[in-house]
Amino acid sequence: MPEERKLVTILFADVTGSTELGESLDPEDVRALMGRYYAHAQRVIQEHGGALEKFIGDAVMAVFGLPRAHGNDAERALAAALALREAIATDPLLGGRLLLRMGVNTGEVVATSDQASGDFLVTGDAVNV
């Protein structure tokens, strides 16, 4: 996809207290918890029609409206945020251990596609939630 302007909705989810969690648990346990969190995030984002843009440490960034707009991308992103919060809260290993901060923002971005991976890269003020 050549570089083009798109109206998209961005979802960010970030684990609060991850530094303290890392200090209180064995690194392998932290990796296992984060792996479960990432798996839930990836599943929920896909189920709601979003594209996982990247994992950034303990944060997840997803884009709704790429490669194609649905007309209700903001609603899809909000539904994904609520579903992710519910998935983490009800996971027997994560519930009560991982708390999330989330932000959802809609705006215009410049979008490009990485030819090798097919992943989308977005840049613009909407990304700065």
Q: Predicted segment positions?
A:
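Catalytic core of nucleotidyl cyclases, primarily class III adenylyl/guanylyl cyclases
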Residues: 7, 12-16, 44-76, 87-127
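Intrinsically disordered or compositionally simple regulatory linkers and C-terminal tails
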Residues: 1-7
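Conserved long alpha-helical elements within nucleotide-processing catalytic cores of c-di-GMP signaling
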Residues: 19-42, 53-54
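Hydrophobic alpha-helical membrane-association signature
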Residues: 30-37, 77-80, 84, 125-129
